[in-house]
C-alpha cells in the first residue's frame, strides 16, 4: 500500500514538472546559513512582500505570510523544481519589535552576508508605493561592499501609477542597478524574474 502511494505520488510529481507546474519545497529555518550550495537571497524591509513573492514563484503557499510586519525572523530555505536554493531573510526596519529582537535580526542578516557565503545573487525587494528608504540605501551599499551581485525588485506595482514607476526606474538608473517592476500578487513580470533565476 505504501509503495503504491509512493508510485502515484512520483507520477503526479513528474506530470507537474512536465506540464510546467512549479514544484517547490520548504527545507528549514535557521539562524545562520545552514547550506553550502549556491543560493539566491531575498531581502527587504518588513512587509514588502518577500514571502508572498516566494509563494508566487512556487505557485503555491509554502511561505507563511502576514499583514503584520516582522513575520520572518529567521533564514527560511526553499528549493525549486530545478533543485536551486532560495533564502527568505528576515525583514529589516520594523520598529515595533524589541531592541533585543532587532539586534538579533541585524546579526542574522550581517552574518548571512559574509564574503565567503555561496550567494549567486541578492534580490532586494521594495514596496513600490514607498520607494527607496534610508535603510534600503544602507543595505544596498553593504551588499555591494560585500561583493555580491544585486538586483532590485520593486514589488506591488499593481498599486502604483506610471509616474511612480518611472521615478523608481530613474532612481535605479542613478544607482546603476538592475531594477525589475513586479507584482507578486498579480504575478506581473514574474517570467522576467524567472529568467534572472536561471
Curated annotation (Swiss-Prot):
It comes from the Bacteria. Mg(2+) binds at residues 51, 72. Its cofactor is Mg(2+). Pfam families: MMR_HSR1. PROSITE patterns: G_ENGB. Coiled coil: none annotated. One of its GO terms (biological process) is division septum assembly. GTP binds at residues 44-51, 70-74, 88-91, 155-158, 182-184. CDD domains: YihA_EngB (cd01876). Keywords: Cell cycle, Cell division, GTP-binding, Magnesium, Metal-binding, Nucleotide-binding, Septation. Residues 36-198 form the EngB-type G domain. One of its GO terms (molecular function) is metal ion binding. One of its GO terms (cellular component) is cytosol. NCBIfam families: GTPase_YsxC, small_GTP. HAMAP family: GTPase_EngB (MF_00321). Necessary for normal cell division and for the maintenance of normal septation. Belongs to the TRAFAC class TrmE-Era-EngA-EngB-Septin-like GTPase superfamily. EngB GTPase family. This is Probable GTP-binding protein EngB. The gene is engB.
Amino acid at each position: 500500500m505504501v509503495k503504491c502511494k509512493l508510485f502515484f505520488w512520483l507520477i503526479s510529481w513528474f506530470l507537474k514538472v512536465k506540464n510546467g507546474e512549479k514544484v517547490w519545497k520548504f527545507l528549514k529555518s535557521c539562524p545562520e546559513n545552514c547550506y553550502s550550495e549556491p543560493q539566491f537571497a531575498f531581502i527587504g524591509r518588513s512587509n514588502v512582500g518577500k514571502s508572498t513573492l516566494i509563494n508566487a514563484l512556487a505557485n503555491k503557499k509554502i511561505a507563511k505570510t502576514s499583514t503584520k510586519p516582522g513575520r520572518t525572523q529567521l533564514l527560511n530555505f526553499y528549493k525549486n523544481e530545478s533543485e536551486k536554493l532560495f533564502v527568505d531573510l528576515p525583514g529589516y526596519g520594523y520598529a515595533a519589535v524589541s531592541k533585543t529582537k532587532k539586534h538579533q535580526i541585524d546579526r542574522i542578516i550581517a552574518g548571512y552576508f559574509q564574503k565567503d557565503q555561496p550567494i549567486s545573487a541578492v534580490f532586494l525587494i521594495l514596496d513600490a508605493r514607498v520607494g527607496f528608504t534610508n535603510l534600503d540605501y544602507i543595505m544596498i551599499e553593504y551588499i555591494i561592499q560585500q561583493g555580491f551581485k544585486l538586483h532590485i525588485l520593486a514589488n506591488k506595482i499593481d498599486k502604483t501609477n506610471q509616474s511612480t514607476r518611472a521615478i523608481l526606474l530613474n532612481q535605479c538608473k542613478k544607482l546603476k542597478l538592475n531594477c525589475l517592476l513586479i507584482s507578486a500578487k498579480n504575478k506581473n513580470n514574474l517570467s522576467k524574474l524567472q529568467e534572472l533565476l536561471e
